[in-house]
UniProtKB/Swiss-Prot annotation:
Family: Belongs to the ATPase gamma chain family.
GO molecular function: ATP binding; proton-transporting ATP synthase activity, rotational mechanism
Cited CDD domains: F1-ATPase_gamma
Top-level lineage group: Bacteria
Topology in the lipid bilayer: Peripheral membrane protein
Protein name: ATP synthase gamma chain
InterPro entries xref list: ATP_synth_F1_ATPase_gsu, ATP_synth_F1_gsu, ATP_synth_F1_gsu_CS
Protein's GO biological process: proton motive force-driven plasma membrane ATP synthesis
PANTHER family linked to this entry: ATP SYNTHASE GAMMA CHAIN, ATP SYNTHASE SUBUNIT GAMMA, MITOCHONDRIAL
Protein's job: Produces ATP from ADP in the presence of a proton gradient across the membrane. The gamma chain is believed to be important in regulating ATPase activity and the flow of protons through the CF(0) complex.
Localisation per UniProt entry: Cell membrane
Pfam assignment, any one: ATP-synt
Xref: HAMAP family: ATP_synth_gamma_bact
């Protein structure tokens, strides 16, 4: 009996050891990807903030009836949910889908959905949501190409009057251990209040500039949100893999103790039987 028990435990130890190697390797990869994602996000920050400031000044100088500021007559809202293509990243995808479901559930007839990431597609199908467009295979280091493709689709729907608002549901990267799901409205543009600042003058007219700048602005918005999402995904995956590796170590410690106890008990019993047999021969 002891021998059979030892064999089973040895198999479990081997299986968990192999799993630990995988989770440890994935954790190291996630750490490397997170470092790159943070660098990309930081590099984009200054340009993103400066561009937003310029757009805000242009919007403040433009006509309040401008399509991109005043909106259109549609009462439908488009939600773009940013999820991951691969799993093993803790509650990252679940949190985004839950946030999306919370804002759309009560008004499904007027809510349209675009999903980014394979996991989002799977989640929303289970919740019986239909999608207008699906974007997958987003690289770990997304570029303007991916942002432009999504922005073009959203702008096309907005300019045709098929939707009246565009919101992006994404995970904001705050730190390695802190990420927060946000719902960000990107259209129509809502200019920030500019207190005690003179309205800038533009040449050519602000309306013409706005028409040309709006597409780039939406692309930059989506690009920044994709960078936030990717950094958050990698941070969540790194944390999940670290936890999995720690759990594997705890299991291995417990199994090794159990293995040694059974082995010690078997040896003790064997010695007892030998001694008992020797005594019987006297």
């Amino acid at each position: 009996m002891a021998g059979a028990g030892l064999i089973i435990i040895k198999r479990r130890i081997k299986s968990i050891t192999n799993t630990k190697k995988i989770t440890n390797a994935m954790g190291l990869i996630a750490t490397s990807n997170l470092r790159k994602s943070r660098q990309n996000l930081e590099a984009n920050k200054a340009y993103y903030e400066a561009f937003n400031d310029v757009i805000n000044k242009i919007v403040s100088s433009s006509s309040k009836s401008n399509l991109y500021v005043a909106g259109n007559k549609s009462d439908k809202k488009l939600y773009i949910a940013l999820t991951s293509d691969s799993g093993l990243c803790g509650g990252f995808n679940g949190a985004v889908v839950t946030a999306a479901d919370n804002v759309m559930r009560g008004d499904k007839d007027k809510s349209l959905l675009i999903t980014v990431g394979q996991k989002g597609i799977s989640y929303f199908k289970r919740l019986k949501y239909e999608t207008l467009s699906e974007y997958v295979d987003i690289p770990n280091e997304p570029g303007l190409k991916e942002a432009k493709e999504i922005a073009d689709r959203a702008l096309s729907l907005y300019e045709k009057g098929e939707i009246g608002e565009v919101h992006v549901i994404y995970t904001q990267f705050l730190s390695t251990v802190n990420q927060k799901v946000e719902v960000k409205k990107v259209l129509p543009i809502e200019p920030k209040k500019m207190e005690k600042v003179s309205v800038a003058e533009f040449e050519p007219d602000a309306e013409i500039i706005l028409e040309k700048a709006i597409r780039l602005h939406i692309e930059q918005q989506l690009f920044n949100l994709l960078l936030n999402s990717k950094a958050s995904e990698q941070a969540s995956r790194m944390s999940s893999m670290d936890s999995a590796t720690k759990n594997a170590n705890d299991l291995l410690d417990a199994l090794n103790i159990k293995y040694n106890r059974i082995r010690q008990s078997a040896i003790t019993q064997e010695i007892t039987e030998i001694v008992g047999g020797a005594e019987a021969l006297k």
